[in-house]
Amino acid sequence: MSGNKNIQKFRGEVSREDRENIHGHRAAVFWFTGLSGSGKSTIAHAVEKELFDDLMRVYVFDGDNVRHGLCADLSFAPTARTENIRRISEVAKLFVENSTVCLCAFISPLLSDRQMAREIIGDNDFYEIFVTCPLEVCEERDVKGFYKMAREGKIKNYTGISAPYEAPENPDLIVETDKETLEESVTRVKEFILQKVKI
């Protein structure tokens, strides 16, 4: 939030509700959290394609992509990770005002950071999806070798190895990617989203 009292929000002629009615669905943020390699981005992008094919306004905010632009100046230190989540949350909130279903795929390992995201976006527009998978399976999926480098000490502050991951306490949906196929996960997530955004 800006500390400058001379800056005030401007409300235009078109409301969020007007946009949602035109597009035939509510906007909301579906926040995918889980270890690297758990399947967050894969599921989010597959769901995005299906919803897009159904003519819905939908967009994936992917951790790697955001790090190339909006948050390219940030490190992976704890304070920088928090700022990363704060920026993403503020942008996602703007997309919600534009009647877009936002699929945010970020490790976001700390409970406090995810709570901050919920508070920025608004409790009524925020749904937490816990994409869970055993660490050893995530490591097996790691084609880039980041887990191996983290275990060798070549990468610092790597979630699950040298930095903590705090699992959600009460997620809105749990997806166990070691126990179901990608198609099953995508179907469950899509059905959950459609239930939440129907008008």
Language-model features and meaning:
Residues 69-76, 92-150, 157:
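ATP-dependent NMP and nucleoside kinases share a basic, alpha-helical "lid"
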Residues 132-135, 140-188, 196-199:
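Small-molecule kinase domains that catalyze NTP-dependent phosphoryl transfer to phosphate-bearing small molecules
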Residues 40:
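Conserved lysine of the Walker
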Residues 60, 126-130, 172-174:
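Conserved beta-strand scaffold positions in the cores of enzyme catalytic domains, especially
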Residues 1-29:
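Extreme N-terminal, non-catalytic leader segments
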Residues 36:
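The conserved Walker
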Residues 45-90:
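Conserved substrate/cofactor phosphate-moiety recognition/catalytic segment
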Residues 32:
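Hydrophobic anchor at the beta1->P-loop junction of P-loop NTPases
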